[in-house]
């Protein structure tokens, strides 16, 4: 009844990268290298893990009371080293990096990072006649990501279940096969932050004197915080399992409440500190919801069966607290300065925060002047601080929210007019799988879905306009407002002529013109880039055939099956990007980002299962 088990693993990898630009490239020219520029990087990493568990099981009173005790220990360690060297000003480019003495060192960088995690844990399980079940666990984790005094976290949990259908008062209920009530409470820790964030690090930088480069120490962008500690999530769960009609209908319902405190967040700090951000334990959030799983046998005959598996989940998040922010009850988390997220006490996570896009200025927003020019009509909003005489038809326009006006009483908008413009959290998600079997044939069709979630289409924002060097534009810019009269090849100021050139200016799909006025439109935090990400995906279809036993018995086979599987067959969605099921490069505070996410591939698999 006593079992001791040990598991161990080791990983080592090395990556070497050599890069060379001869003197004819722009990169070499930018690095003052008429005969070439290059760098050589060497990265090495190894990690190991050892887990030991001791398990003891015993019973009392002829298995009426079953006990199981487990004790365990786990150690994980990783270390990485890197050496990066850049060379420029080569006097001869024929040898490349084979002779770096031909050039001058530009940057020499090296680094070493270590990370370790030590865990001890225990579990006690008790089972009384498969009717009453109890489990308690205790886990302690020590992480090198925190400073001494904060490295260890203690995380207990417990669960209980009551199989009500085993009670005497239900033994005469023939249609009921299983009725089980479950309840659980537990805690878990999270240390998912960059390494060494409890200390302030420094890097190397350049400064020039008399045409020569000198290397010096410079502070990093992140200020260390020795007070960092484990993020903690407390989970409460109540569930019910029901099986009826000879287990042809099985239902599981779970209600859960997860509260996370001491959230580890990289927070913006005043630039007067000399740094831009710092990891802090600054908040608490709650996720609450219900999950439902339904399994049914819809048809069951001698030759044909049809089973359905269906699941659906409803989750609602809420920000409970924000520490260290007494002035306001919210803060704005920017993602690469391209979209804002409003994290606000009492509100859900995933709130996109930006300006409300109001289409473009049409010719109706202007008055033709006697000198052939035009001006913006009074009462038409414009950007605060921007000369209204420079506004043109086809410029992007936004909705003022604050009621602010300029000195002439005209409404204006600014960054103060940003508001909540969407939410990345779906109202519900789920999936359904139908399996059909007829004699030796089987067919399985799986679909999954999400409804009510918004997506920040960063791909559109990046490539919508030709404002960056060597950048093409998306095809939607073919339907842009034009200021150029093709008969003259010049910009026209005639409003009547502009209306003739842009008959679709009142449509929802008209794009702004590509004048300098709209250069900021590719970086504005705007509702234009927020789209409905709801979808229904036909994810997998599998068709198989199992050969009759009498066909294969002479081949010394006990079972033989051939099958074909199609993956990612089709997706029904209104999203304009490749895939609405995205969250590229995003975290809990910045979800729902499509940053040129690689599209899911369609694939097929043909296989054979043989059992000897």
Describe each PLM feature range.
Residues 438-458:
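Glycine-rich phosphate/pyrophosphate-binding loops
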Residues 430:
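Extra-cytoplasmic beta-strand recognition segments
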Residues 28-29:
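A conserved P-loop NTPase coupling/switch region
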Residues 1-21, 32-347, 520-612:
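Extracellular/periplasmic, surface-exposed regions of secreted and cell-surface proteins
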Residues 143, 452-561, 566:
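Extracytoplasmic gating/loop element in the C-terminal half of outer-membrane beta-barrel translocons
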Residues 84-86, 91, 280, 297-422, ...:
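Conserved small-residue
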């Amino acid at each position: 009844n006593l079992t001791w088990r040990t598991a161990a693993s080791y990983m080592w990898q090395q990556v070497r990268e050599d890069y060379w630009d001869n003197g004819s490239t722009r990169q070499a020219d930018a690095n003052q290298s008429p005969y070439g520029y290059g760098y050589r990087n060497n990265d090495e990493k190894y990690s190991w893990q050892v887990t030991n568990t001791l398990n003891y099981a015993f019973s009392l009173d002829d298995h009426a009371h079953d006990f199981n005790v487990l004790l365990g220990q786990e150690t994980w360690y990783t270390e990485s080293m890197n050496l990066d060297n850049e060379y420029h000003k080569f006097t001869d480019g024929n040898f490349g990096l084979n002779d770096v003495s031909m050039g001058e060192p530009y940057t020499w960088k090296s680094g070493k990072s270590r990370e370790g995690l030590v865990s001890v844990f225990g579990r006690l399980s008790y089972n009384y006649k498969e009717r009453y079940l109890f489990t308690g666990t205790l886990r302690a984790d020590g992480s090198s990501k925190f400073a001494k005094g904060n490295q260890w976290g203690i995380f207990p949990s417990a669960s209980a279940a009551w199989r009500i259908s085993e009670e005497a008062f239900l033994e005469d209920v023939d249609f009921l096969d299983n009725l089980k009530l479950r309840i659980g409470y537990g805690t878990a820790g999270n240390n998912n932050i960059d390494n060494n964030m409890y200390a302030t690090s420094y890097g190397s930088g350049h400064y020039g004197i008399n045409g020569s480069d000198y290397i010096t120490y410079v502070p990093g962008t992140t200020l260390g915080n020795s007070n960092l500690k484990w993020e903690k999530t407390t989970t409460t769960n109540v569930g019910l399992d029901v099986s009826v009609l000879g287990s042809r209908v099985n239902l599981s319902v779970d209600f859960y409440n997860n509260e996370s405190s001491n959230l580890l967040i990289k927070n913006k700090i005043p630039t007067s500190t000399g740094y831009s951000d710092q990891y802090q334990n600054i908040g608490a959030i709650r996720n609450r919801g219900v999950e439902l799983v339904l399994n049914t046998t819809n048809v069951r005959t001698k030759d044909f069966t049809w089973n359905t598996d269906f699941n659906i989940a409803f989750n609602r998040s809420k920000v409970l607290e924000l520490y260290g922010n007494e002035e306001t009850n919210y803060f704005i988390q920017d993602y690469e300065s391209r979209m804002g997220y409003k994290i606000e006490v009492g509100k859900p996570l995933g709130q996109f925060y930006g300006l409300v896009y109001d289409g473009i200025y049409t010719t109706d927003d202007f008055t033709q002047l006697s000198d052939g020019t035009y001006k913006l009509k009074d009462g038409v909003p414009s950007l605060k601080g921007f000369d209204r005489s420079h506004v043109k038809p086809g410029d992007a326009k936004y909705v003022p929210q604050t009621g602010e006006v300029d000195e002439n009483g005209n409404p204006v908008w600014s960054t103060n007019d940003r508001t909540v413009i969407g939410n990345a959290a779906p109202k519900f998600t789920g999936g359904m799988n139908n399996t059909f079997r007829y004699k030796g044939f089987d067919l399985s069709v799986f679909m999954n879905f999400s409804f009510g979630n918004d997506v920040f289409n960063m791909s559109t924002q990046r490539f919508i306009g030709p404002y960056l060097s060597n950048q093409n534009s998306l095809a939607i810019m073919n339907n842009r407002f034009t200021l150029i009269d093709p008969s003259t090849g010049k910009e026209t100021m005639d409003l009547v002529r502009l209306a003739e050139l842009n008959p679709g200016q009142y449509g929802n799909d008209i794009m702004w013109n590509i004048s300098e006025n709209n250069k900021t439109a590719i970086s504005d935090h705007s509702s234009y880039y927020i789209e409905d990400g709801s979808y229904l995906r036909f994810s997998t279809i599998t068709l198989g055939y199992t050969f009759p036993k009498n066909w294969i018995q002479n081949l010394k086979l006990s079972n033989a099956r051939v099958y074909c599987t199609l993956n990612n067959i089709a997706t029904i969605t209104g999203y304009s990007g490749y895939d609405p099921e995205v969250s590229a490069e995003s975290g809990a505070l910045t979800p729902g980002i499509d940053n040129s996410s690689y599209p899911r591939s369609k694939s097929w698999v043909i296989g054979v299962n043989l059992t000897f």
